[in-house]
A protein has these predicted regions:
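Catalytic cores of large soluble enzymes that bind and process phosphate-bearing ligands
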Residues: 41-48, 119, 123, 149
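ATP-binding Walker
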Residues: 77-78, 122
């Protein structure tokens, strides 16, 4: 059996001190700060990630009615990473064939995405207002009326 050292090839960027504190966040996805080509070139698609991607794209293609997916890995288990991969493939259809081998739906173009991270709990309209803004619904009565739960004051 080969050792881990024999099986792995470490990328030079792993040793780059300027990248040590680089941790991707869903905000990076929403604000288009992630290079999809580089992301998929430098990341491995695990079995769990592939399952999530295929099931989500089945939903996007209306081949499945499952609209929610529970990501229950422990902290550091790849939940954000999986969501970023899904978001990038939704936004960039040109990478789907390469990343999801055997997946091809010529009728499914770019999929609009919205995301919210708990790290931004100070968003002016909270989670639902942030999502409404991302999908172009921020001017709806649900976000503009004074009695809207989206306009409620946050505790503290």
């Amino acid at each position: 059996m080969n050792s881990l050292h024999e099986l792995c090839e470490v990328r030079e960027e792993v040793f780059d001190p300027s990248r040590r504190d680089t941790v991707l966040d869903l905000t990076d996805l929403i604000e288009d700060r992630i290079n999809a080509r580089r992301f998929f070139k430098t990341n491995y698609v695990t079995n769990g990630m592939e399952t999530l991607l295929r099931e989500a794209f089945d939903r996007f293609s209306r081949q499945s009615q499952q609209g929610t997916f529970l990501l229950n890995q422990a902290m550091g288990g790849g939940k954000t990473h999986n969501m970023i991969a899904l978001g990038l493939l939704a936004k960039h259809p040109e990478f789907r064939d390469e990343v999801l081998e055997g997946y091809h739906d010529p009728n499914l173009g770019r999929v609009r995405i919205a995301a919210f991270t708990g790290r931004e709990s100070d968003a002016p309209l909270g989670i639902w207002g942030s999502i409404a803004e991302q999908i172009g619904k921020s001017n709806s009565s649900a976000t503009t009326t004074s009695r809207s739960p989206l306009r409620a004051r946050r505790p503290g």
